[in-house]
C-alpha cells in the first residue's frame, strides 16, 4: 500500500460544487483515488450479505454508471450505500464531472486515476467515452438542503440547458 500525497484533497467535498464552484469541483474530482476489484479495503464478509447488497469497488462502480448513462445496460438505476465520511459525495462529484464533460482535461485526469486503480477498467471507460463522444446530463442534488425534489430537478435541468444556450421554452 502506497500513500499518494499528490492525490490528497484536504477537506469535505460538497456535491453542490458541481453547480456552483467549478474550481473546487475540478480540484476535488482530480484528487479522487479510485480502487479496483483487486484492492478493496473491506470484504463482502465485513459488510454482510443478509441485506442483499453487493460490495463494489469504485472503478467498477464508475464503469457501471457510465455504461448506464449511455444506455449499455438495461437497469438505469444504481445506488451507493456507505457510512458517513466514506467518500460518497466525492465519488458523485467526480462522476458528475466526468460524465458532464467527458472530453475535458479534468475527465482525462479522472480516467487516468481509474487506470491507476485498474488498467483494464480504465481502458474500457476511455473507449466508452471515445465512442459516445457526447456528455451526459448529471443532476447533482445535495440531500442536506431543504427543497421540493421535483422543483429542484426541474431547476437544474433548466439551468443546464441555459448554460449550453439551449431554449427552455
Per-region residue spans from a language model:
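P-loop NTPase nucleotide-binding core
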Residues: 74-77, 81-169
